[in-house]
């Protein structure tokens, strides 16, 4: 008899995230990079919820960092440059992914994230990395 909690056979297939050399970003950051189909499905989910897609990119650091203070601050790496305007009225996930491709073409060494805004409640509902630079 054991006192260890187990979820059965699945315990054998669980992995530990390597803590060295791996930065955490946004939602889904513990998973491998999204394939094109997975990216389309995430954007489709965002649109199905009625959220407005918006793209942002960051050239230097794609993660939260403490540059000005040792304790966390709201401005340290959280604000990125917006790519064009939010995509109000967009209903096609392929259109959003095409814009991601445009950001990557213009700034290949940038981190690119997709954000979904609820324009009624005026809040950000989802945010995930759509592209990480080759050098990362």
Curated annotation (Swiss-Prot):
One record GO biological process: photorespiration
InterPro entries: RuBisCO_ssu, RuBisCO_ssu_dom, RuBisCO_ssu_sf
Alphabetically ordered keywords of this record: Calvin cycle, Carbon dioxide fixation, Chloroplast, Photorespiration, Photosynthesis, Plastid, Transit peptide
Cellular component terms (Gene Ontology): chloroplast
Disulfide bridge map: none
Compartments where found: Plastid, Chloroplast
Quaternary context: Heterohexadecamer of 8 large and 8 small subunits.
Note from the entry: The basic functional RuBisCO is composed of a large chain homodimer in a 'head-to-tail' conformation. In form I RuBisCO this homodimer is arranged in a barrel-like tetramer with the small subunits forming a tetrameric 'cap' on each end of the 'barrel'.
Role, per record: RuBisCO catalyzes two reactions: the carboxylation of D-ribulose 1,5-bisphosphate, the primary event in carbon dioxide fixation, as well as the oxidative fragmentation of the pentose substrate. Both reactions occur simultaneously and in competition at the same active site. Although the small subunit is not catalytic it is essential for maximal activity.
Name of the protein in its database record: Ribulose bisphosphate carboxylase small subunit, chloroplastic 1
Organism: Pisum sativum (Garden pea)
Gene name, Swiss-Prot/TrEMBL: RBCS1
